[in-house]
Design a protein with these regions (language model features):
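Phosphate-sensing "switch" segment of ASCE/P-loop ATPases
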Residues: 295-298, 314-321
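Intein modules and their embedded homing endonuclease domains
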Residues: 1-153
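P-loop NTPase catalytic core of nucleic-acid-dependent motor ATPases
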Residues: 52-78, 121, 134-254
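AAA+/SF3 P-loop NTPase mechanochemical coupling elements
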Residues: 247-253, 285-304
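Conserved AAA+/SF3 P-loop NTPase catalytic/coupling segment centered on the Walker-B
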Residues: 255-279, 311-318
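Catalytic nucleotidyl-transfer cores of nucleotide-processing enzymes
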Residues: 124-132, 297-310
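Substrate-gripping "pore-loop 1 plus following alpha2 helix"
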Residues: 234-244, 271-292
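A short, contiguous, amphipathic alpha-helix enriched in charged residues
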Residues: 33-41, 223-226, 267-283
C-alpha cells in the first residue's frame, strides 16, 4: 500500500491506546468515540516540541500534506479517512466505530491541523529533494531524507555532484554561441532555486532568435527537468493584460519559474509587469473561490521570442529588468 509507512506509524503510536476500543459495542458510545478522537489527534497533529510526530501538515489554502518517507506530498482528505479506518481495523476497534466514527475522527484532526499555526506547511526552499536525498543549498551538501526538511521542490532524479552532459553542452553551445551569454543563461536558471525572500532578483530573461534555432529546446529541457509542480507556462499577456489574470496569478503562486515558449509581438509593459518581475505581491483568485488570495511567491520569468517585444514604457526601471 502506498501509505503503509503512515499506517505503521499510527499503529505504533496511537495503536496501543485504541486497541480493542468498543470491540463489543453494538452502538457508538460517545465517550469511546471521544477517546478515539484524542488518540488519533495526538499523533496526526502532534504536540509542541515533539518533532517525531510531524508527519501531517496543512498549507495556507487548507490542503493536506503528508510526509511520504522522502518529502511532503498532497493527500486527499478521503485518503486520510481510509487510513484511519485501516488503523482501526488492524487494532481491532469495534466495527460500529469503523463505520460510524472514523469520519468524525478525521474531521476532528483536520480542524486542529487547519487551526494550529504549528501545523502549517511552510516550505523552505533552502532544501531540494532528489531521489537519493535532500540537498541543502546553505551547506551545499546532500542529506538523508528527514521530516525536518520541509520543501516543495521535488526533482525526480538523483543528485550527482560532478555530473556532466556532453549533449547539453553541445546543444547549448550551438544555440548560444557567446560564452558570456551561456554563463548568463546558466546563472539565471540557477536563480530558479534561490529563495526570493533571501535574494533580490529583479530580472526577466528573453532567449531571442529566429525560429528553429534551438532556443525552445534548451529552455524546455530546463523547465521539463524541474517538472509541472514548480513550473507554469503562462504568456505575459495572460498574466498582465488578460481579464482572467487573477486566476492565472493564483496558479503561478509558489512556482519557481514561469516559461513562455513564444512571446507575441504585443506590448505587455507597465506597472504589473515591473511589479511581477521584481517579485511584488498581487491579489489573485482561484476558480470557483469567492475569496481572493494573496499571491506573494512569484516565479522568475523565462521567455522565448523571435525578437524583443515592443514597449511603451521607456523608464529606466523597465529596461533594468
Amino acid at each position: 500500500m502506498k501509505y503503509q509507512h503512515i499506517i505503521d506509524y499510527l499503529i505504533q503510536t496511537a495503536g496501543p491506546s485504541i486497541e480493542d476500543a468498543g470491540l463489543s459495542d453494538e452502538r457508538v458510545n460517545k465517550r469511546t468515540e471521544a477517546g478515539l478522537c484524542k488518540s488519533f489527534r495526538r499523533y496526526i497533529c502532534g504536540v509542541e516540541g515533539d518533532e517525531d510526530c510531524d508527519y501531517f501538515k496543512v498549507d495556507e489554502e487548507g490542503m493536506l500534506y503528508v510526509f511520504n518517507g522522502q518529502y511532503y506530498e498532497l493527500m486527499l482528505e478521503e485518503t486520510l479517512l481510509e487510513l484511519i479506518i485501516e488503523v482501526m481495523e488492524k487494532k481491532n476497534v469495534g466495527i460500529v466505530y469503523q463505520t460510524g466514527s472514523a469520519k468524525i475522527v478525521r474531521d476532528y484532526c483536520l480542524n486542529r491541523l487547519k487551526g494550529d499555526e504549528r501545523c502549517k506547511f511552510v516550505p523552505n526552499r533552502q532544501y531540494i529533494c532528489f531521489k537519493n536525498g535532500v540537498f541543502d543549498l546553505g551547506t551545499m551538501k546532500l542529506n538523508q531524507f528527514d521530516l525536518k526538511y520541509k520543501t516543495d521542490i521535488i526533482l525526480d532524479f538523483d543528485y550527482v555532484a560532478d555530473a556532466k552532459s556532453a549533449l547539453w553542452d553541445k546543444v547549448l553551445g550551438m544555440t548560444v554561441p557567446d560564452e558570456n551569454m551561456r554563463e548568463t543563461f546558466h546563472q539565471y536558471c540557477g536563480c530558479f532555486l534561490a529563495s526570493r525572500t533571501e535574494y533580490k532578483i529583479e530580472y526577466i530573461l528573453f532567449v531571442v532568435g529566429e525560429g528553429q534555432n534551438g532556443k525552445s529546446i534548451i529552455c524546455k529541457a530546463v523547465v521539463n527537468m524541474l517538472g509541472p509542480n514548480v513550473a507554469s507556462s503562462y504568456s505575459p499577456e495572460q498574466l498582465f493584460k488578460s481579464s482572467q489574470m487573477e486566476y492565472h496569478l493564483a496558479d503561478v503562486n509558489g512556482k519557481i519559474v514561469n516559461y513562455c515558449d513564444e512571446v507575441s509581438n504585443k506590448d505587455f509593459s507597465g506597472g504589473d509587469f515591473k511589479q511581477f518581475v521584481s517579485g511584488g505581491a498581487f491579489t489573485g483568485r482561484h476558480p470557483y473561490s469567492k475569496r481572493p488570495t494573496k499571491v506573494d511567491k512569484i516565479p522568475l520569468m523565462l521567455c522565448c521570442a523571435n525578437k524583443i517585444p515592443p514597449t511603451t514604457d521607456d523608464t529606466e526601471g523597465y529596461f533594468r529588468r
